[in-house]
Amino acid sequence: MAQPRIPRDLLPSDPRFGCGPSRIRREVVASLSEPGSVMGTSHRQPPVRHVVAAIREELTELYNLPTDYEVALGNGGATLFWDMATVSLVEKRAATGVYGEFTRKFSSALQRAPFLADPAVFQAEPGELALPEAVSDVDTYAWAHNETSTGVVAPVRRPNDIDDNSLVLVDATSAAGGVAADMSTIDAYYFSPQKNLSSDGGLWLAILSPAAIERSNRVTSSARWVPQMLDLSLAVTNSRADQTLNTPALATLVMLEAQCRWLLDQGGMAWAASRTASTSGTLYRWAEDNPLTTPFVADPALRSPVVVTIDIDESVDAARLCARARDNGILDIEPYRKLGRNQIRIATFSSIEPSDVEALTACLDWLLENRD
């Protein structure tokens, strides 16, 4: 027997709520095939290099960067940047905050490096936060601005009492373009563009301090063997020429530039941060008011404005709820696969309309009231 359908008047105008790859505005996708598009042209020639230059300039404006900070980019995504930071930025030992799957992955990359001492790991259970603290023999401190697997947001600031020469690296993959941050006290704010920045994956970008660039120059010119793809100093050199070491996906660059420009046109990071705080707030209030749902992150101060995780009462099969939502065209509200909880996870990235989030809560109410 066919399942009853969510009434069409309840459905969101755009049903994509995944935490990555995220919703890309339809007009941006359409622009890829318009006359004059750079698609199918050389990434070494001015039209594409102008796109790269625009991305670097727009990110500089979006984050109001100090004049001596630089934006670098390259192929491979944030996962590659973990390895790049391991070989190009950490001299002897790092300290990491681990409070979810993605913070754990960078810590594991550091652990595997045969030329580094084991990292000092500050760890919290999923849904909680642990930031690295000063350690005497550590030269690099690392954590994530937003832990995508759990929906925990962390501060972006230099830890107290660390050595003046230590670097601070912050993974911003699900925060960049949606959560405000001050770059002036940290050294690398790195990310992939497939979330708030509404592009595709496979590219990394990093906002770098002069200290990070100097460290990369020194480490990569030392006796340590560094593959070209993991040589941050080489990536910086190419970025200064508005290029990447090897051929990038042009569509990714075009969509990223369009989103950066759109965010600036809307009001910049202040507008984006206000919008994501509002849309996530809609979901957190809904989860608190519904007797069958609870925000997974107990501390309101740690609740992410861009990745909302909601526990579902044991009387409801969350996997079945997600499947029924998908059957009705509502996409990608499943939880992070390795967390293993009876929950849903919903993106409230900057491209997601507040009205669509309101509609989603109505659809979830309907599904909960009409569950089998």
Question: Where on the chain are the PLM-derived regions?
Answer:
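N-terminal "arm"/small-domain region of PLP-dependent enzymes with the aminotransferase-like
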Residues: M1-S42
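Conserved PLP-binding catalytic core of the aspartate aminotransferase-like
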Residues: T294-R324
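Conserved N-terminal alpha-helix of the aminotransferase class I/II PLP-enzyme fold
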Residues: L32, G36-M84, E101, K105-A109
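Active-site C-terminal subdomain of aminotransferase-like
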Residues: R23, Q194-Y284
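Conserved PLP-anchoring active-site segment centered on the Schiff-base-forming lysine
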Residues: L89-F102
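Active-site phosphate-binding strand-loop segment of PLP-dependent enzymes
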Residues: E125-G177, A188
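Conserved active-site segment immediately N-terminal to the catalytic lysine
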Residues: M183-Q194, W204
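PLP-dependent enzyme catalytic core of the Aspartate aminotransferase-like
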Residues: D14, K338, N342-D372
